[in-house]
UniProtKB/Swiss-Prot annotation:
This is RING-H2 finger protein ATL38. It is a single-pass membrane protein. Belongs to the RING-type zinc finger family. ATL subfamily. The lineage of its organism: Eukaryota, Viridiplantae, Streptophyta, Embryophyta, Tracheophyta. GO terms for cellular component: membrane. It comes from Arabidopsis thaliana. The chain crosses the membrane at residues 15-35. Pfam families: zf-RING_2. Its main location: membrane. PROSITE patterns: ZF_RING_2 (PS50089). SUPFAM superfamilies: RING/U-box.
Amino acid sequence: MVQPGTEIKASDLTLLVITIILFAIFIVGLASVCFRWTSRQFYSQESINPFTDSDVESRTSITAVRGLDEAIINSFPTFLYSEVKERRIGIGGVECAVCICEFEDHETLRLMPECCHVFHADCVSVWLSDHSTCPLCRVDLCLQPGERSYLNPEPDLVESTNSHLFDGVTWTNRNRPSRSWSTRLSQCRVSQILISRSHSTGHSVVQPLDNLDRFTLRLPEEVRRQLTKKTVDNVAFSQARSSRRGYRSRSAGSERSVFSYQRRMHSFSDCAWSTSCGGEAVAPSKDSRRISVEQSQLDDRV
């Protein structure tokens, strides 16, 4: 027969084991709750301030380097379509590749000097503020004279335009009435799509451009010279006026780079336009040489 003391000791041992198990479960549960709460607080702070100051500065500097300087953008030939409509080479209408709208007489256009592609000034300014290439053929607009010539862009660039236009952003437009910059944007539907990496599916995700000539403005040599001279003179006048008034918004290095770009555009303009736009090579005129000399003198003063 079992002694009474033995039964009491067995009951105490069972109770002790159960107590230890419950205590262990309580400790594990408490630790889990604390861990979850701490993790939630950490990720909440990360979502509010995901980047450190150094990350923000680095991202800002990278973004700033990607686009063109505003003064360089303004140095591209800018004019009203009515000024060149009757003097351009070719037949048919000319359209802006950004908003797919045909140009009208009262609209201001901006011409890419390296490839002769033309866009609405407002449309292409948005692109050039984040990129340094032509939005249509992707020719580099910042090439220096010693680098690969921008007169002969890679053939793949033009063909890839069918599937890479604007990094996967398709602009579509169905109506073409008279419009301003704001109404052009309201008519254009911007749809985010997968970039060229989705071509493995077997079909293009961007509408093909079957005729790039409708986005190209070819002008006679004399007209081109007049537009270039007018634009460069306007930029030089604006720079000189702002310098005299003491309202410089850029450093001396930035100003010198702009003037250097303008001189390069003068020195290469004859060859660039005649070669890339289908014209014949013409020797620089006395006016062009005079403008280059005056521009160099103005740069030295600055």
